[in-house]
């Protein structure tokens, strides 16, 4: 329940712009969020492995 409240709080426009922070659009995790995809590193990895993110390939060098 607390996580849902924090997600709702993050969606609201803050009084000051600096207070805004990114959250994963899938699970609500506040840390390690890729801005381009709006996903945290864990969700990004899972979705990339399943092929749900077009254009994302596993790096190999």
Swiss-Prot record:
Please tell me whether the keyword Ribonucleoprotein is annotated for this protein: yes
Supply the alphabetized keyword list. Answer: Metal-binding, Ribonucleoprotein, Ribosomal protein, RNA-binding, rRNA-binding, Zinc
**Needs which cofactor?**
Zn(2+)
**Cellular component annotations (GO), alphabetically ordered:** cytoplasm; small ribosomal subunit
Q: Could you tell me which Gene3D superfamilies the record lists for this protein?
A: 30s Ribosomal Protein S14, Chain N
Spell out the SUPFAM superfamilies in the cross-references.
Glucocorticoid receptor-like (DNA-binding domain)
Write down how the cofactor binds this protein: Binds 1 zinc ion per subunit.
UniProt KW Ribosomal protein keyword: yes
- Which GO-annotated molecular functions does the record name? rRNA binding; structural constituent of ribosome; zinc ion binding
State the similarity comment.
Answer: Belongs to the universal ribosomal protein uS14 family. Zinc-binding uS14 subfamily.
What PANTHER family would the database entry show? 30S RIBOSOMAL PROTEIN S14, SMALL RIBOSOMAL SUBUNIT PROTEIN US14M
Q: How does it assemble?
A: Part of the 30S ribosomal subunit. Contacts proteins S3 and S10.
Provide the protein name: Small ribosomal subunit protein uS14
* Organism the protein comes from: Thermobifida fusca (strain YX)
Taxonomic classification: Bacteria, Bacillati, Actinomycetota, Actinomycetes, Streptosporangiales
What gene is behind this protein?
A: rpsZ
